[in-house]
C-alpha cells in the first residue's frame, strides 16, 4: 500500500511532477478512493489486470475493462475487497470507502 504514496512523493520532489491527477493516480492505484478521476480509475484498473496477473477472474476483469470504466471499477474494487476478506487481511479505510461508494453506483 505504501509504494503508491511514496512513488507520488518521489515523483513530486525528485522529478518535479506537479500534476495532481498524475500524483493521485500514483497515490491511490492500489487502494482506490471516493472521487477518483478518470485517470485514477484507469491506473487502478490497469494495475489490477496487468499481464502478469494470473488470479481467478482476471480475464473477466480484463473484458469488462474494455467495455465500461464504471463497471470495471465496481468489479475490480469488489474483487480486491473480497480477496482481502477471504484471506483475512486488513482492508485499508479508503478501499472500504471506495467499495461502499461503488455499491451505490448503477450497474
Model-assigned labels for residue ranges:
Residues 1-77:
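Divalent metal-dependent catalytic cores for phosphoryl transfer on phosphate-bearing substrates
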Residues 82-107:
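Charged phosphate-binding loop/patch that engages nucleotide di/tri-phosphates or the phosphate backbone
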